[in-house]
Amino acid sequence: MHTTQKDTTYTKIFVGGLPYHTTDSSLRKYFEVFGDIEEAVVITDRQTGKSRGYGFVTMADRAAAERACKDPNPIIDGRKANVNLAYLGAKPRIMQPGFAFGVQQLHPALIQRPFGIPAHYVYPQAFVQPGVVIPHVQPAAAAASTTPYIGYTGAAYAQYSAAAAAYEQYPYAASPAAAAGYVAAGGYGYAVQQPITAAAPGTAAAAAAAFGQYQPQQLQTDRMQ
C-alpha cells in the first residue's frame, strides 16, 4: 500500500540567517509557539557538524505557517533570521529608512543656478587694464550689494578707470591716439593696448587729484628719432 505524500507547499517554511550554534531543538522551540510542528531541521556542514545558516520547518497546518511568517524581524538564537514559505524563497531585505541613499534635497532656487551657487557669488565679467584685472560691477548693483567679496563701490571703479586712463601713457607712443596700433621705434614694433574710455570729466578730475603722485612719463626726443 502506497502512502500519499502530504502537500507541504503552504506549510513548509524556509529559515535563513541562523547562527552556527542553532540546533534542531532550538529551532523547534522557536516555532512551536505558532502551532504544531511536524518537522524542524537545521542544515549542517558534513565536516564540522555546525549549522550552515539555514533550515526548514514544516508546520502541521497552513494557518500556523502563516502566523510564523508574519513577524518581519524574527530573532532566533539571538540573531535576526529570514522566515518565509519555502516555495517563495527568502524574503528580500528591507532597507531601513535611515540608510536609504541619504541625499539631501536641494532648494529649487539653487538647482536653477549653475553649480548651485547663489547669484552674488558667481564671478562677473571683467575689464582688463594693462597689468590690472578689474571686475565689472554696475554702480547701482555695487552700491546695493552687501557681500564681503566686493569691497569697492561703483564710484571707486569709475575713479580708478579715469586715473588709469590718465596714467597709462606709453613711452613709445607720441600721443594716446597713436597707441591704438603699432608704433615703430628704432626698428622694433611694440603692440600697445588701447585704454578703455575715460569716465565723466568731473570724475576724471577727482581721480587725477587722488592719483596725482603718478605723473605721465615725458617723451624723450632722442628715443623717438
Swiss-Prot record:
GO terms for biological process: 3'-UTR-mediated mRNA destabilization; cell differentiation; DNA damage response; mRNA destabilization; mRNA processing; mRNA stabilization; negative regulation of cytoplasmic translation; positive regulation of 3'-UTR-mediated mRNA stabilization. InterPro entries: Nucleotide-bd_a/b_plait_sf, RBD_domain_sf, RNA-binding_reg, RRM_dom. Residues 11-88 form the RRM domain. GO terms for molecular function: mRNA 3'-UTR AU-rich region binding; mRNA 3'-UTR binding; mRNA CDS binding; pre-mRNA intronic binding; sequence-specific mRNA binding. One of its GO terms (cellular component) is nucleus. Keywords: Cytoplasm, Differentiation, mRNA processing, mRNA splicing, Nucleus, RNA-binding, Translation regulation. It is found in: Nucleus; Cytoplasm. PROSITE patterns: RRM. It holds the Pfam family RRM_1. The RRM domain is necessary for mRNA stability and mRNA translation regulation. Multifunctional RNA-binding protein involved in the regulation of pre-mRNA splicing, mRNA stability and mRNA translation important for cell fate decision and differentiation. Plays a major role in pre-mRNA alternative splicing regulation. Mediates preferentially muscle-specific exon inclusion in numerous mRNAs important for striated cardiac and skeletal muscle cell differentiation. Binds to intronic splicing enhancer (ISE) composed of stretches of GU-rich motifs localized in flanking intron of exon that will be included by alternative splicing. This is RNA-binding protein 24. It comes from Gallus gallus.
